[in-house]
Amino acid sequence: MNYGEKSPALWDAIKSEEKRQEDTIELIASENIVSDAVREAQGSVLTNKYAEGYPGKRYYGGCQYIDKVEQLAIDYAKKLFNAEYANVQPHSGSQANMTVYNALLKPGDTILGMGMDAGGHLTHGSKVNFSGKIFNSISYDLNPETEELDFDRIRQLAIEKKPKLIIAGASAYSRIIDWQKFREIADEVGAYLMVDMAHIAGLVATGAHPSPVPIADVVTTTTHKTLRGPRGGMILSNNKELGKKIDSALFPGTQGGPLEHVIAAKAQAFYEDLQPEFTQYIDQVIKNSKAMAEEFKNSKNIRVVSGGTDNHLMIIDITKTGVTGKDAQNLLDSVNITTNKESIPGDKRSPFITSGLRIGTPAITSRGFKEPDAKEVAKIIIEVLDKPEDAGVLAEAKERVNDLVQKYPIK
């Protein structure tokens, strides 16, 4: 075999995935479509270079251009979020969160984060995750009537449990989050406040959601999702002294060599996010999300959790359709709509089955969908879930999906 000869099986799978993305309406809220420039940066020769350490303080030689790349990513990130400190090396959002915990906590310390069925993330204290195994994790839920954050209850839990760290942010919450209320609770009990804004980072960057950066001690995020960059993580803060602890907690504390080709792709994405067109994009993401939510609210069998959305996603309760979240996910897959099953607040079904779906609009907006198109997608979902065994309905749904993806090809 010649060096560099392609594996036919591998490239067949890659081409098949490319076709799947082109032919599918992508509604997974954490997915998006990156630019060719982001992909080019990630596939560059930077993948060949080891660069343990930070710009100007490397353990290897030959890092002069790597330093320029990483410093650009840092500078763009700081400008994008008006932050004093940025670390762009975390391999993922989970690694970013782990790094912050390692910097601020000791094993056994108490953390207070959003529960999974309320919309929280595994790394916010789930018992099956490192965050719930290494630390004493306490979860807060939503107000059962409004299905929104219950700050009185969060404050009560904080006073009772005395956490060293309070975690704000979510992976499945559709409303504006009041960071200042979290700050007041954290100050009252003497806790650090960490915000995980992985899902809404793009909205924060454009001002479509209030920024946690001036309020929290530290902010973590992914660099994909609404930032439309490569898969990876980042840590921000306005506290430079805390930043020094985070730097050492990440390297050598949590990771070794950074993925500089991914950091280059992060820099390119942040550069794109700083352009005026990105603000227009995020505005359209929210318009599409609200349009879909309104269409679902007009359905007799689908309920939108909390009654609507303020951001890029919504959770829909499909209990009345008689279809589980798992079956709905598979059913929609069959008509080329990709979404994911999601627990609803107080869900009696397991997280592997669920009574809901999470719907997000970042990827369809990147393709060019506008409000009428978003409404059409919602109508297709409603009809499929209302008549899940009607072959005619499913065939028509697939045709309507095909019309939309042909109208808005991935560029």
Swiss-Prot record:
It is found in: Cytoplasm. One of its GO terms (biological process) is glycine biosynthetic process from serine. Its main location: cytoplasm. Transmembrane segments: none annotated. The modification N6-(pyridoxal phosphate)lysine is found at K225. The record marks H224 as: Plays an important role in substrate specificity. Its cofactor is pyridoxal 5'-phosphate. InterPro entries: PyrdxlP-dep_Trfase (IPR015424), PyrdxlP-dep_Trfase_major (IPR015421), PyrdxlP-dep_Trfase_small (IPR015422), Ser_HO-MeTrfase (IPR001085), Ser_HO-MeTrfase-like (IPR049943), Ser_HO-MeTrfase_PLP_BS (IPR019798), SHMT-like_dom (IPR039429). Pathway: One-carbon metabolism; tetrahydrofolate interconversion; Amino-acid biosynthesis; glycine biosynthesis; glycine from L-serine: step 1/1. Keywords: Amino-acid biosynthesis, Cytoplasm, One-carbon metabolism, Pyridoxal phosphate, Transferase. Homodimer. PANTHER family: SERINE HYDROXYMETHYLTRANSFERASE, SERINE HYDROXYMETHYLTRANSFERASE 1. Belongs to the SHMT family. Catalyzes the reversible interconversion of serine and glycine with tetrahydrofolate (THF) serving as the one-carbon carrier. This reaction serves as the major source of one-carbon groups required for the biosynthesis of purines, thymidylate, methionine, and other important biomolecules. Also exhibits THF-independent aldolase activity toward beta-hydroxyamino acids, producing glycine and aldehydes, via a retro-aldol mechanism. This is Serine hydroxymethyltransferase.
